[in-house]
Swiss-Prot record:
GO biological process, one term: xenobiotic detoxification by transmembrane export across the plasma membrane
Assigned keywords, A-Z: Membrane, Transmembrane, Transmembrane helix, Transport
GO cellular component, one term: membrane
Family stated for the protein in its record: Belongs to the multi antimicrobial extrusion (MATE) (TC 2.A.66.1) family.
Gene it is expressed from: DTX11
UniProt signal peptide: none
Protein name: Protein DETOXIFICATION 11
Single GO term (MF): antiporter activity
Keyword Transmembrane helix part of the UniProt annotation: yes
Species for this entry: Arabidopsis thaliana (Mouse-ear cress)
Membrane topology: Multi-pass membrane protein
Membrane-spanning segments: 35-55, 73-93, 122-142, 151-171, 184-204, 211-231, 264-284, 293-313, 330-350, 377-397, 412-432, 435-455
Any matching Pfam family: MatE
Keyword Electron transport: no
Amino acid sequence: MEDAESTTKDPVDRVEKVTWRDLQDGSFTAELKKLICFAAPMAAVVITQSMLQIITMVIVGHLGRLSLASASFAISFCNVTGFSFIMGLSCALDTLSGQAYGAKLYRKLGVQAYTAMFCLTLVCLPLSLLWFNMGKLLVILGQDPSIAHEAGRFAAWLIPGLFAYAVLQPLTRYFKNQSLITPLLITSCVVFCLHVPLCWLLVYKSGLDHIGGALALSLSYWLYAIFLGSFMYFSSACSETRAPLTMEIFEGVREFIKYALPSAAMLCLEWWSYELIILLSGLLPNPQLETSVLSVCLQTLSMTYSIPLAIAAAASTRISNELGAGNSRAAHIVVYAAMSLAVVDALMVGTSLLAGKNLLGQVFSSDKNTIDYVAKMAPLVSISLILDSLQGVLSGVASGCGWQHIGAYINFGAFYLWGIPIAASLAFWVHLKGVGLWIGIIAGAVLQTLLLALVTGCINWENQAREARKRMAVAHESELTESELPF
């Protein structure tokens, strides 16, 4: 009698483990379809977003090797110190807003988005000062003075784009966490189509040269934020989740920071390890060639990583929604479906990259040495792509569960205690140069993927669903108890 009563009161579905038989009852296929319908347009969104930086590098790169190297350095530095940090902080919404939407606390999404914008804008103030003095800092760090000076000028013109990014990232997650991908898709495609001619005009016709690329990137980020903000304000699709600007946005600052800091640590520790490789390449003999080649490899990896990142975004959203709704079994099935998609994507894209390795360098540069070096690096980039596809989805699972702090510990150990030391040893002591740097990154990614897989296998999904419900009850100011949440 007591057990029956507790079962009625407990809104979380009880499931021991998802077995192979469970995956054959139609739930797996249905979840696979949901993920594909979410991830396919989301992949286009991620690709067009990442292509803004890549197109900028391509257009600037044809001005010459110095322009490509300085723009690469500037974008790498700005990614490390600004864009990655802002994106990482905003990832807190993957847990908070995703679970709030699953719990049908729709208005919380708008409030949380405004809270994130406020916090991220404040963060941009000290970061902009750092960017303004980037050229001097790079010289102090021992970088080539000519590259450092031009990179500093490029970064200064990217400062307006940083503030736009602080608005753009919460808006992106506001739409993503309620599975409204169409506004993101339309906006990203429009901005991309505008960015290409805008960047070309500012670089080649305005007399700004490579500085025009930075200005074009900043303007495109602002256009992106304005378009999404307008859709949020005017569209009827956002009527339930839209919230007015009130003092309530300041009440959620502490909760946002609680999840934002570990989210930022998780993302940044991985992102920074790749960017650190670019900075280390500037200390190698022939720094212009090494920096240009590794920057091309990193941008290629970023572009091809768009599909697994979209799958990870879909998995994170679906898991957080299901946990917020108390559906632990459905959340568990999402993991199997997402990993299946990631494996297929890794094999297809990795094979395609190897097949086109001789053409890859020509997209970014007309310098023969750069083109040949990029072709030599392509097999290593393919291995990185396969590993990133797997760990990307596993990281998405951690975000959906609110386990970003565990992901941060894993990324720190895998890259900074293992991968980066191996990279430095191979590059400077074994004299493998850029190849050695990338092998070290692969070693870190292998350990990262194994540890994330181990953690995912140990998740108790029933407990995760119960914790999500408790979190939503607290967010609802305890006006509703855990069992009274409006599912």
